[in-house]
């Protein structure tokens, strides 16, 4: 795609620094090179250059890099100027370059958008650039790089390829739809439905793992009232985020706090104490607590160490029974260990393993942090990539359409209905990589990028 306008923007952060970099991309870049450098540098070589203003006044000197189309990040002619890190020099250079006809400042994310529109990267890879820049943990950096290198795109493209092959097999027989459907075709359709379902399930699984890195592992702090749940949230997050009192039922709504534990991104969720109550407001809080518990990746179940051991076991067993079908990782925590002056270690009560802590004094908290990291690292898999909410929504749309198509086929054996569903599935999946997309979606995605990307 040829853009009439050429764009320019600083690649480096604003402010004083040792080096600042300007990037220029577009059809006028050769003219920019001739006017600012005096000539076009040798392609893909670092060239020492003087950066010229009007009337050949030297504004700065440094390194120029020339990437002729299509062998550049954007797929267009690209010039990069690496000069001294003075904001004033950068401003003078930008003013000089934008004075050239059809050259303007780039919008946020416009270089990446042009790379996408010119087929250099797909939409997943474009989003991965933004995710990589905004990564706050080592695991999310690795996952963003996997996406940038095309691992995520490969999963989606394999799924699309299966859908296209399926469509090809059945659409060729639509012209003969008034005839009895061939037994071999029926058999093929069932085989393809099974194959497609298996690939959907596999893709949904890896996307679910990828969303944990993007949004953080959801760790819900649950337990009876006054067990010290809010104190634990404060201790883990090094903050006074939650209100702590001796009055049972102080926490009545969900409280979220995003933290990083040794490079593991986590979202802590403090919940209302679980008990039977007639208080309507507290009951709503408890209902919300159960809702978020059932969607958790990990539950820290906190009970008061001063409670009788038989009662501790009863409370834990009741909780396990309530969420047994959800297959959620549970860590049992005995809080207020400082009040009984016991050792801060792990202990077994019958078959359950407990970690002893004092959220008030901070004792045992480091041991709990190490435990959370150990579980997270055991769950982490190489090759996981970042999955955005947009990706998850599109996969769910495609999978739900598939389930409907499968059901309709079993009931009606209508090839035309099946073909239409496969067409929709193909479109839903294509929107993930950008094969089918709208200008509004592109604007929303790329406007969140920083200028220069």
UniProtKB/Swiss-Prot annotation:
Chief localization: cytoplasm
Position of the signal peptide: none
Residues noted as binding (6S)-5-formyl-5,6,7,8-tetrahydrofolate in the record, renumbered to the chain: 23, 80, 120, 453
Keywords attached to this entry: Cytoplasm, GTP-binding, Hydrolase, Magnesium, Metal-binding, Nucleotide-binding, Potassium, tRNA processing
Keyword field contains tRNA processing: yes
Subunit structure: Homodimer. Heterotetramer of two MnmE and two MnmG subunits.
Designated name of the protein: tRNA modification GTPase MnmE
Organism: Buchnera aphidicola subsp. Myzus persicae (Myzus persicae primary endosymbiont)
């Amino acid at each position: 795609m040829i853009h009439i306008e050429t764009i320019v923007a600083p690649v480096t952060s604003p402010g004083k620094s040792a080096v600042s970099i300007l990037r220029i991309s577009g059809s006028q870049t050769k003219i920019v090179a001739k006017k600012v450098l005096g000539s076009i540098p040798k392609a893909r070589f670092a060239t020492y250059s003087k950066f010229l203003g009007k009337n050949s006044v030297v504004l700065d000197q440094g390194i120029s890099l020339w990437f002729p189309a299509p062998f550049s990040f954007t797929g267009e002619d690209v010039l990069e100027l690496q000069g001294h890190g003075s904001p004033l020099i950068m401003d003078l250079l930008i003013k000089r370059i934008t004075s050239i006809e059809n050259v303007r400042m780039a919008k946020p994310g416009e270089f990446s958008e042009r790379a996408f529109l010119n087929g250099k990267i797909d939409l997943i890879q474009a989003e991965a650039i933004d995710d990589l820049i905004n990564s706050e943990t080592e695991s999310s950096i690795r996952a963003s790089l996997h996406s940038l290198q095309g691992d995520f795109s490969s999963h989606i493209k394999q799924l699309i390829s299966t859908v296209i092959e399926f469509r090809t097999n059945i659409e060729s027989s639509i012209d003969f739809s008034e005839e009895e459907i061939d037994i071999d075709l029926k058999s093929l359709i069932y085989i393809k439905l099974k194959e497609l379902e298996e690939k959907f399930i596999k893709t949904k699984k890896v996307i679910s793992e990828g969303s944990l890195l993007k949004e953080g592992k959801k760790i819900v702090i649950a337990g009876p009232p006054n067990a010290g749940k809010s104190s634990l949230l404060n201790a883990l997050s090094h903050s006074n985020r939650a209100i702590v009192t001796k009055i049972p039922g102080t926490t009545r709504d969900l409280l979220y706090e995003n933290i990083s534990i040794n490079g593991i991104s986590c979202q802590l969720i403090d919940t209302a104490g679980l008990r039977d109550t007639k208080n309507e407001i507290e009951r709503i809080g408890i209902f919300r607590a159960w809702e978020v518990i059932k969607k958790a990746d990990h539950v820290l179940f906190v009970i008061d160490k001063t409670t009788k051991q038989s009662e501790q076991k009863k409370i834990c067993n009741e909780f396990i029974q309530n969420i047994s079908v959800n297959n959620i990782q549970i860590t049992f925590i005995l809080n207020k260990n400082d009040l009984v002056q016991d050792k801060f270690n792990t202990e077994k009560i019958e078959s359950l393993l407990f970690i002893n802590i004092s959220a008030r004094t901070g004792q045992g908290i480091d041991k709990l942090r190490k435990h959370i990291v150990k579980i997270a690292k055991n769950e982490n898999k190489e090759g996981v990539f970042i999955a955005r909410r947009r990706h998850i929504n599109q996969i769910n749309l495609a999978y739900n359409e598939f389930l409907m198509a499968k059901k309709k086929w079993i009931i009606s054996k209508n090839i035309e209905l099946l073909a239409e569903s496969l067409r929709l599935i193909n479109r839903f999946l294509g929107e993930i990589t950008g094969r089918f997309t709208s200008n509004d979606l592109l604007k929303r995605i790329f406007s969140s990028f920083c200028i220069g990307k």
